[in-house]
Regions:
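Conserved GNAT-fold acetyl-CoA-binding loop/helix
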Residues: 17-43
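Conserved active-site alpha-helix within GNAT-family acetyltransferase domains
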Residues: 91, 114-132
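Conserved acetyl-CoA-binding loop-helix of GNAT-fold acetyltransferases
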Residues: 86-99, 124
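Residue-level recognition of the GNAT/N-acetyltransferase active site
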Residues: 81-85, 113
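A short beta-loop-alpha structural element at the N-terminal edge
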Residues: 4-18
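Conserved beta-strand in the GNAT
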Residues: 55, 61-69, 74-79
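Conserved GNAT acetyl-CoA-binding A-motif
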Residues: 101-113
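A short helix-loop-beta-strand connector motif used in the catalytic cores of GNAT acetyltransferases and
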Residues: 44-55, 74
Length: 145
């Protein structure tokens, strides 16, 4: 079944959290996310305020999402259910987020783990300019082409 990429709706928020806590790499629980200020209410408020998230939908089920912080010029999140990884959904979600960010910014950034599959994935999409930000994390950047 083909996936559709569309802007996220407030009603998608519980599904976004289901996807977020399902991942194996960079796993965080709902409680850990809440300690960082990332709650369903906060994410719903962000989505209601401006177009800042996209979902990959298979059938009627969201199976992945990406989210940006436009003010910060950052790709805030990009996650796909483990059962749907390797199908190009992450690439499509990141490209949708990049397109929106590049409407207002010449350079965008994200943070991820240094030795993760995600870091390699982002590099394959043209992200670079690696900067060590401590612990095991790096910041990658991408310029509008």
């Amino acid at each position: 079944m083909t996936a559709q990429i569309r802007p996220a709706l407030v009603s998608d928020v519980p599904h976004l959290f289901r996807v977020r806590i399902s991942v194996n790499e960079n796993h965080l629980s709902v409680d850990q996310l809440a300690q960082m200020g990332i709650t369903e209410e906060a994410v719903a408020g962000m989505i209601a305020a401006s177009p800042c998230a996209w979902v990959a939908v298979v059938g009627d089920q969201p199976v992945g999402f990406s989210m940006i912080d436009m003010d910060e010029a950052s790709l805030f999140a990009a996650f796909v259910l483990p059962t749907h990884q390797g199908r190009g959904l992450g690439r499509k979600l990141v490209l949708a987020a990049e397109e929106k960010l590049f409407e207002c910014h010449e350079e965008i950034w994200l943070e991820t783990g240094r030795e993760t599959r995600a870091a390699g994935f982002y590099r394959s999409l043209g992200w670079g300019g690696q900067q060590d930000i401590g612990n095991v994390d790096i910041r990658l950047t991408k310029r509008r082409s």
